[in-house]
Amino acid sequence: MYKKISLMVKKHGLLNSFIYKVNVILSKLSNNNVRLMNYYFFAQPITDQCVIRNASKRRIKIYMPESDDLIFAQCPRPKAVIEERFKQKSKCFVATKDDQFVGFIWFSEEKYIEDEVRCEIVPRPVGVTAWDYDIYVNPKNRLGMAFPMLWDRVNQYLSQKGYKWTMSRISPINSASLSTHKKLGAIYSGQALFLCLWQVQIMGSSLPPYVHISTIKQPKIHLLAPLSPSSKC
């Protein structure tokens, strides 16, 4: 046990490891009514340059489904969650292989209301910055071309509409996602920590409004994109 914790601290840092372990314990003891959620926010530059060449010749197909598409019956998200996302005007691209679900990526060109905590995400500037979330690929397909093909398609779509950036949130413990986003030129944009105690939610963030406490209302976090895509690290 000590060795496992030591490796986690070495990989993610003492604070992030502590927050993660506390969340696991609190969630388990409270039947998920008490949670401590830690998020990093990143900005990724939009580019019309494809990662995958000759994508049309591959067996994996990428398309944008309507809300009533039967493919959603195969995806690992409840029907109510999918319906709420379309209600919020979110869009997604789905990857399929031989008509079977492989993965998807969701994004919003406007505000987005989080489904893990009470929070409204507002990417800015309008028409320049989008919000992407819930990138999922079936475990057996994660070493294949599904993710880069999905990412290419989102980039093409947003680039054609004039977008320069897409923002996203990532758990500091999700090393794979952090590594992937850094390879895409992601820039760290802030952090937020949510303590959920049944109906009470306490937020502390490096971004305005910095501190928010409520039982019903949700904080609104404005995520401002970097000045220029050329500034990416």
Regions found by a protein language model. Give the residues of each.
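Conserved acetyl-CoA-binding loop-helix of GNAT-fold acetyltransferases
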Residues: 131-160, 179, 183
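Long, compositionally biased intrinsically disordered regions
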Residues: 217-233
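Acyl-donor-binding surface of acyltransferase catalytic domains
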Residues: 1-73, 79-81
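Conserved active-site alpha-helix within GNAT-family acetyltransferase domains
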Residues: 172-190
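Conserved acyl-donor/pantetheine-binding loop and adjacent beta-alpha core of acyl/acetyltransferases
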Residues: 88, 96, 100, 104-130, ...
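Conserved catalytic-core motifs of GNAT/GCN5-like acyltransferases
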Residues: 42, 187-202
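Catalytic micro-motifs at enzyme active sites that drive phosphoryl/nucleotidyl and oxygen chemistry
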Residues: 80-84, 118-119
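Conserved GNAT acetyl-CoA-binding A-motif
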Residues: 158-170
